[in-house]
Amino acid sequence: VELTPRQQGVLALQAVLPILHLGLEWYRGFHEVIIIPEPVTRRQEVQDEFGLVSEFEEENAGESWPQGPLVLAWSELQQDGDWDGFNLVIHELAHKLDMLGGDADGAPPLPRGMDPQQWTRALQGAFDEMNDQLTREEVTEIDPYAASHAAEFFAVCSESFFTDPLRLRAVYPAVYDQFARFYGQDPAARYPATRLLAGDPGAQG
């Protein structure tokens, strides 16, 4: 996908938002962002508690690996930019921050002065609460994909922190407080919303 200078700039602005007060060194370990036209479909295998293996196809709009590039689907990026709790760039870069601590597990290295126990207590409590809601077949305020894994909970809540901060603060105030300390920002204070990425039809696949 070939992007215009404006589109490149807008994506760069979104990418720098999470590390605005952390510093560029928090993006160490990767040096490339690959933009593909559409999400990638991969065949996955999952083993249940009885040892039975089943296959399914999973569509990935973005992917990130330790020391590897960031892969983002342009068709999905064009839908981002509103303050609606969804942002692919922030989601995948949150995984990159998470991986600085080793495996992606929702426990990135914390800035000096933060209490790891408070971090774990806040995120684990909210993660368990969301899973309990889904068990009761209730509608969640945050994207239920967050309940699939601790790493996804961190990434999805990071999306919400920056693009729907009032909702995250209302639903999971302890998580919002920890994120405000981690990212060194209070996005709820900069409401009202502003468009981060206006869909520009000028891109070429």
Where are these regions (language model features)?
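Short alpha-helix carrying the canonical HExxH Zn2+-binding catalytic motif
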Residues: 81-98
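Metalloprotease/metallohydrolase-associated module, dominated by Zn2+-dependent proteases
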Residues: 13-21, 38-83, 100-205
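Extended cationic-aromatic binding surfaces that line active-site or macromolecule-binding grooves
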Residues: 1-42
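A structural signal for short, well-ordered beta-strand segments and their strand-loop junctions
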Residues: 29-35, 71, 97-99
